[in-house]
Amino acid sequence: MTPLTYEQAGVDYDKIDPLKVAAQRAAAQTASQLAQHGFSEVQASRGESAYVVDVGPFYLASIVECLGSKALVADAMARLTGKNHYAAIAQDTIAMAVNDLITVGATPLVVQAYWAAGGSDWFGNAERSLALVEGWKRACEVCGVAWGGGETPALAGIVEAGRIDLAASCTGIVNPKQRLSVGDALGDGGEIAVVAVGIA
């Protein structure tokens, strides 16, 4: 079997990374804005899986994560099997955001949804749309987070017709502060314990 590469999927990090570096440098210059609220960034978290802000008694952590091309798999499976997989895809989207957030020691609190379709017709398929909603709700319950809201743009001409781009943002807290796991808190010999939630 021939291995698949990011390049074959249209992802060229040699072209993407310069933008990411420029964005991180520009973003770092805005960190001083937090001081007007009495807050400060945890510099070691910049560029990591989640961004962390010191708000005094605890740390605030946030992340946004896109599912990527996995929705294409759900569409292909629906064509092959006739079964709807959007409840599972919803859970995958939340899992990606929550998993990134917990890497810094944060407890996730709130998830927001971003569901951008290639046109209003995508949302008009009631079975698929309701599966997405129910899967999203179920994932929130499993992760112990509130679903705060979100955005559902119909982006004809930007997103391909008949497709959807799924993403989630997640906000949480690191409390007590000693749970923070970035920078010097990570190193050789460290141990990370994960408690199973019973999902197979």
Describe the residue ranges of each PLM region.
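N-terminal amphipathic/basic leader segments beginning at the initiator methionine
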Residues: 1-40
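Glycine-rich phosphate/pyrophosphate-binding loop regions near the starts of catalytic domains
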Residues: 28, 35-199
